[in-house]
Swiss-Prot record:
The nucleosome is a histone octamer containing two molecules each of H2A, H2B, H3 and H4 assembled in one H3-H4 heterotetramer and two H2A-H2B heterodimers. The octamer wraps approximately 147 bp of DNA. H2A or its variant H2A.Z forms a heterodimer with H2B. H2A.Z associates with the vps72/swc2 subunit of the SWR1 chromatin remodeling complex. Also interacts with rbp1/DNA-directed RNA polymerase II largest subunit. InterPro entries: Histone-fold, Histone_H2A, Histone_H2A/H2B/H3, Histone_H2A_C. The modification N6-acetyllysine is found at residues 5, 12. GO terms for biological process: CENP-A eviction from euchromatin; nuclear-transcribed mRNA catabolic process, non-stop decay; regulation of transcription by RNA polymerase II; silent mating-type cassette heterochromatin formation; transcription elongation by RNA polymerase II. This is Histone H2A.Z. SMART domains: H2A. It comes from Aspergillus oryzae (strain ATCC 42149 / RIB 40).
Amino acid sequence: MPGGKGKSIGGKAGSKDSAGKAQKSHSAKAGLQFPCGRVKRFLKNNTQNKMRVGAKAAVYVTAVLEYLTAEVLELAGNAAKDLKVKRITPRHLQLAIRGDEELDTLIRATIAFGGVLPRINRALLLKVEQKKKNKTEA
């Protein structure tokens, strides 16, 4: 009597084939390192009116976060390598973010212990060059 009360033949509980398969997380299915479940939980908790969040939306946001993190870490690693050190510091993060035009517009935050970029205003440089030129002519 499939479909009636009592013992049924079909269903997940009766099949022995699915017992051998290991469970895969959403992150593993999408090939990501960041946790999709945690991102989904944050999205659900931080939205107004307790809006529903789809599974694909959480995977997409997780992929974007992972890509941006990898991009920043790669640039910061290059900055650390240029300075011949093996540890990435907030200064390297600052140099990496401010050195890339797109990341600079995206991340407008102040990075603690990041310092400032070495920059001299062009107007000041022109005055110094003119003074040097006047001294050589005189």
